[in-house]
Amino acid sequence: MRIILLGAPGAGKGTQAQYLMGKYGIPQISTGDMLRAAIKAGTELGNAAKRVMDEGKLVSDELIIGLVKERIAQDDCKGGFLLDGFPRTIPQADAMKEAGINVDHVIEFDVPDEVIVERMAGRRVHPASGRVYHLQYNPPQNDGKDDETGEDLVIRADDQEDTVRHRLGVYHEQTKPLVDYYQSEASANNCQYHKIDGTKAVDVVSDQLSSLLG
């Protein structure tokens, strides 16, 4: 089972990716992890990527596709894989198709921007332990303080409202067009497209995925 997860940052893809990996026994493939592994292993593609990154440049789609092909040829991907955070753009999706990397299911997590801003802007973190709270869904016992140590909670830079809105803007500009792209692919019977309401409770979303994917 080969799956692509689509959705804005904060839409709940990461949580459901963990669920799908456990249920179907397939690895999650993230481009960041792949790059780090290839560089560490000193593969030809890894060395090429390192040279580009050392110059402060972005790794080309061609290189990333090469890494994806290399990764999905490994034994643990025989039963399928889960792509999260890739492809991000139409050219990347086209390059994947040209490289013969086919997928069975594309799952879009649909969550309104304002809900995502509320989700992320409400997060508070205890830096020393990594404990995460949420002002609305999981508030600390004492405002702004960690339950166990009483130490101050902080807002991560990634969760600041202006940062979240910027990331959402990038998503809508670059990645949202993939929704139309993969809906067209589904119409041509090249994959199945599923749109999930990501505002529902985590276990409800997991159950829905389970019934959709079988």
From Swiss-Prot:
Reaction(s) the record says it catalyses: AMP + ATP = 2 ADP
UniProt-annotated binding residues for AMP: T31, R36, K57, L58, V59, G85, F86, P87, R88, Q92, R156, R167
Entry binding sites for ATP: G10, A11, G12, K13, G14, T15, R123, V132, Y133, K200
Protein's cellular compartments: Cytoplasm
Molecular-function GO terms, alphabetical: adenylate kinase activity; ATP binding
Region (LID): 122-159
Transmembrane domains' residue ranges: none
Keyword Iron on entry: no
Cellular compartments per GO CC: cytoplasm
One matching Pfam family: ADK_lid
CDD domains hit by this protein: ADK
Function: Catalyzes the reversible transfer of the terminal phosphate group between ATP and AMP. Plays an important role in cellular energy homeostasis and in adenine nucleotide metabolism.
Family note: Belongs to the adenylate kinase family.
Assembly mode: Monomer.
Name of the featured protein: Adenylate kinase
